[in-house]
């Protein structure tokens, strides 16, 4: 339905919004009143969409909190939430036993950028009161999924999620962005060097704040600065073998984070 309403397809700049709105009004001026009314209703419906996808885990979060409300502090000692995008979502789907056996909670949403993760961080992480959070974010930002961005903007979102976690006594594990030298859905983007630069910023920030940094990149990269084909079904997403490489790395990182005062 949203494809029928050009009004909502805007660029994240004031000029872009104005131009698209102007062109739409010129078009609608030539159309019948019923069509204009119908289009307006569609526009309102699209505008009301859940951009950060807060609804994705809302019921699951309620169920977890209800189920665990009487758990002791000792029973909560290993609760860990994984915040991320499709890489995290697929992880929980391809190897659910890894999550269930370790008391890990997957909160990945396909296609999400760090801006969207930040908006749902309170609901999908803080309200669950985990002992630690694993943050894996950035590749969809670089792909431009929610508009133009920079590695500094991505870092601002990662820093904000970190600060929210720490303010609520949640340990933080920051992860490198996985290697990728192309995005099938954004072929015009050349991400390899940007990912390397972003990972350096994440690593430096983790060091400066005495946080745990987990380096997935080095373990998964190939000679072309992309995802090793042995570990991924495409240029971005790990397969089960890839996740099996990642798992001991993140477990070690979580243990280090939980052992710190």
Residue ranges and their predicted role:
Residues 6, 12-18:
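N-terminal amphipathic/hydrophobic targeting modules at extreme N-termini
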Residues 7-8, 124:
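Hydrophobic residues within membrane-embedded alpha helices
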Residues 24-34:
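Bacterial N-terminal signal peptides that target proteins for export
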Residues 34-43:
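Bacterial N-terminal signal peptides
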């Amino acid at each position: 339905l949203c494809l029928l309403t050009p009004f909502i397809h805007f660029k994240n700049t004031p000029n872009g919004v104005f131009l698209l709105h102007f062109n739409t009004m010129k078009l609608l001026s030539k159309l019948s009143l019923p069509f204009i009314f119908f289009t307006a209703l569609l526009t309102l419906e699209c505008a009301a969409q859940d951009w950060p996808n807060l609804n994705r885990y809302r019921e699951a979060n309620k169920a977890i909190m209800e189920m665990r409300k009487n758990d002791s502090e000792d029973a909560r000692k290993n609760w860990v939430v994984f915040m991320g995008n499709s890489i995290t979502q697929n992880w929980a789907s391809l190897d659910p036993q890894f999550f269930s056996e370790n008391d890990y909670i997957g909160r990945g949403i396909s296609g999400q950028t760090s801006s969207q993760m930040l908006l749902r961080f309170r609901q999908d992480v803080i309200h669950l009161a985990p002992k630690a959070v694993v943050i894996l974010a950035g590749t969809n930002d670089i792909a431009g999924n929610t508009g133009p961005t920079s590695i500094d903007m991505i870092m601002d979102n990662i820093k904000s999620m970190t600060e929210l976690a720490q303010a609520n006594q949640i340990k933080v594990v920051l992860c490198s962005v996985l290697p990728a030298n192309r995005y099938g859905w954004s072929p015009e983007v050349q991400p390899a060097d940007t990912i390397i630069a972003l990972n350096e910023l994440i690593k430096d920030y983790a060091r400066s704040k005495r946080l745990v940094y987990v380096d997935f990149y080095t373990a998964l990269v190939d000679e072309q600065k992309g995802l090793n084909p042995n570990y991924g079904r495409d240029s971005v997403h790990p397969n089960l073998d890839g996740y099996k490489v990642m798992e001991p790395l993140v477990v070690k990182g979580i243990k280090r984070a939980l052992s710190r005062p």
